[in-house]
Structure formats: structure tokens, C-alpha cells
Amino acid sequence: MNIRLAGTKDIEQLIKMRWDFTLEDYPDKKIQDSDYNQFHEECESFLLNAFNNNHWYIWVVEIEGKIVSNIYIEVIHKVPRPGRITYPFGYMTNVYTIPESRGLGLGSKLMTEINKWAEELNYEFIIVWPSEQSIDFYSRNGYIHCKEPMENTLS
């Protein structure tokens, strides 16, 4: 088992995992196989951009050359505030382990590495908007509920 940051060589596996994750999590969404090419193009562009800037970090668990789990972290740089040093925070999303690798503690091991990495880089905190099914997982890994954010849905 290898826990590491993803790179451009991982793009095809990451695209497939994102596709599978969406199909699994939203079975009623009526996504067609014919949608894959357009999705692939958009996701590939996103990943190439993510690997070429310092705003996204994609962590993976790899076993025998196959990525079996991933977590995406977007770095959010805050506006400086007088009287204190301003540190960034992380937004965690796209947390996914393939079905046949679940229940092995891989997600928790990945989360442990990410938390150590974020502490070393002086991140102030990491936020995640969990689904109902994932709340226990995040709780086991040190996350607590905070006040609900507000949103303005624009589209």
C-alpha cells in the first residue's frame, strides 16, 4: 500500500473513479454512458489544472499500481487580518474508496496522512460537507460538526 499525492500519470484512474463515485452516489441522476466523453474532457482539464497550480492536492491510496481511494483538498487562502499570521485552510471533497476496498481502514489511513500534512503546512483547519452516510467516518477521524454554512444557490 502506498499513500501519496497524485500526479498526471494518475489522470485516467482519477477520472474513472470520479465517474464511478457519481454513478454510485446518485443512481437516479440518469447519467448515460454517452455522457462519459464530455465528462472525461472536462475532468481531464480540471485535473491538469489542479496538478499545475498550488490550490488542489489530490491524495491517493495505491495498491499494486491501482488507485483504490482518493481525497481532494482545495487550499483556501484567507484575506490577511491585522494582529495575527494568516494561515490557509483546506476544503476536503471527493472522498471515495472503491467498493471492493472498503472496510479495510484505507480511508482512515489516508485521512491520517492528510491531517499530518496539513499540520506540517500550518493549515488552520480542514472543512468537509459530509453526506449523511459519511458522518460516522469523519467523526472517527477527528472531525466535529460546526455551525451550518449559509448558501445562495445561483443555478
Question: What does each model-found stretch correspond to?
Answer:
Residues 111, 118-130:
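Conserved GNAT acetyl-CoA-binding A-motif
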Residues 60, 66-75, 91, 96:
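Conserved beta-strand in the GNAT
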Residues 22-46:
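Conserved GNAT-fold acetyl-CoA-binding loop/helix
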Residues 44-59:
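A short helix-loop-beta-strand connector motif used in the catalytic cores of GNAT acetyltransferases and
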Residues 2-16, 27:
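A short beta-loop-alpha structural element at the N-terminal edge
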Residues 126-136, 151-154:
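Conserved beta-strand-loop-alpha-helix junction that forms the acyl-donor binding cleft
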Residues 101, 105-113:
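Conserved acetyl-CoA pyrophosphate-binding loop and the N-cap/start of the following alpha-helix
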Residues 5, 123, 139-149:
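Conserved acetyl-CoA-binding loop of GNAT-fold acetyltransferases
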